[in-house]
Amino acid sequence: MKNSFRFSFTVITTFIICVLVSGAMVNGQCSFPQPVGPNGKCVPKDCKSLCHKKYKGGSICTTGKPNICMCLVCRRRSPEV
């Protein structure tokens, strides 16, 4: 009886860990920083072009220091109508 409980507990724990890890892998990293121009400023037009060329995704220029071009590559679910 004690061994069957231990086995069941081990199987359930392993299953839960596998589900959590696979969920993290599916989501993955959604944004990738890209270098900005030599003046250190992110130009939205250049950022958009670079991100579309490299990742086929969207882009955003962050404000503040450092000024970074972020490429957004996660697929978003479309709202259900």
Swiss-Prot record:
Pfam families: SLR1-BP. One of its GO terms (cellular component) is extracellular region. Disulfide bonds join C30-C74, C42-C61, C47-C69, C51-C71. This is Defensin-like protein 144. One of its GO terms (biological process) is killing of cells of another organism. Residues 1-24 form the signal peptide. It is found in: Secreted. InterPro entries: DEFL. Keywords: Antimicrobial, Disulfide bond, Fungicide, Plant defense, Secreted, Signal. Belongs to the DEFL family. The gene is LCR10.
